[in-house]
Amino acid sequence: MSPHNDAPSPAGSFTQSFTMSFRPVAGSGLRNSSSNTNSVYSESPLNDSQYSSSYSSTSLDTDDHMSRPLVPGVYVPTVCFFDPVTEDLDTATIGTHAVRLAKAGVTGLTTQGSNGEAVHLTHSERQTVTQTTRSALNAAGFSHLPVLVGCGAQSVRETIQYCREAYAAGGDYALILPPSYYAPLFSPASASVIEFFNAVADQSPIPLLIYNYPGAVSGMDLSSDIIIKLSAHPNIVGVKLTCGNTGKLNRIVAATKAGNKPSSLSASPPFLVLGGSADFTLQSLIGGGHGILAGLANISPKACIEIVRLYREGRLAEAQKMQEVVARGDWTAIQGGIVSTKAGMESWLGYGGYARSPLPHPTSNESAKWKEGFRELVALEKSL
């Protein structure tokens, strides 16, 4: 869990030269906000011909771009599966796993997240994973479930490319990390970070969710002030908080409520605020969050869903008891990352395989340890 660091940092002279601009996608229906027509992105808008894609919108089923609002609940960043020998994508298991999660009752799926080993995939492989997931859901009768797609990159240009490819492959929303390679040149509170998200949102064909995960971006931890400011963009619709800061979560929820009135449990909130780890599911809900987007739900979707249900029904003591089991199981996943998660899935579900190299294969002792670490959680999951 990353430290709770929610204080804004002063922007350096390098970042102070940047200005914000909004330029909606043509035909998107996005409202214009105050913009600077001299934006560094305004003179050469990207166009579809600049990118090649394995999938075009004309090859998709009509269900692939139906409206799928984001509603409160449990979202799962799905694991990506590979052939154990060749490390090629195992599309059969990718599709089967997506349907298993849908049948468990999750609210939506995410491809190309940390659990999906996005950093190990090529552009075309990312599209294959997303398209396989969307097609499997549609074929199994779950065409209503939204698919979020990790689209973060180090430049505005490539991030927009990922967003367009995600849309072409059937994705509904883009989950975006802030750029981090040149993090010393700008701070989490700087104009350049704001400019990055706004520039991507202006040209993305799908709405964005901000992904605040300091551990993956050189420690960059976006403040609640920055996230609240970005929430005003019509094409930025939510945030995933893997920082674990429930105080930040509470501030964002309070500032983005429509008319400061709580939204219906079944309605799409004006700005979706999700906890980024299952070990603080209940804490996120108590703080006003709308649910979680958590990797542990690959193993225990029903347990995560049950915590949400118990909380909504006012059965706090029961929810707390279940949260304790989930938190202990999540600690095993946190300690071993995707390696332990896949090992646990292999041990208890009969599939999971290995992460792509250079991540190591677990030793027999490690596999046994992680199997034991998930034992209590799996027993709970099977009881539901």
Question: How would you describe each model-predicted region?
Answer:
Residues 21-24, 36, 56-219:
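Active-site beta->alpha loop and helix N-cap motifs at the rims of alpha/beta catalytic domains
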Residues 94, 126, 130, 159, ...:
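A general structural signal for well-ordered alpha-helical segments in protein cores
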Residues 121-124, 186-189, 221-223, 251-252, ...:
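Short secondary-structure transition/capping segments
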Residues 2-6, 14, 18-31, 41-43, ...:
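C-terminal alpha-helical cap/extension of soluble enzyme domains
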Residues 104, 128, 132-140, 165, ...:
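Alpha-helical structural signal in soluble globular domains
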Residues 199-203, 214-334:
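Catalytic alpha/beta core domains of metabolic enzymes, predominantly
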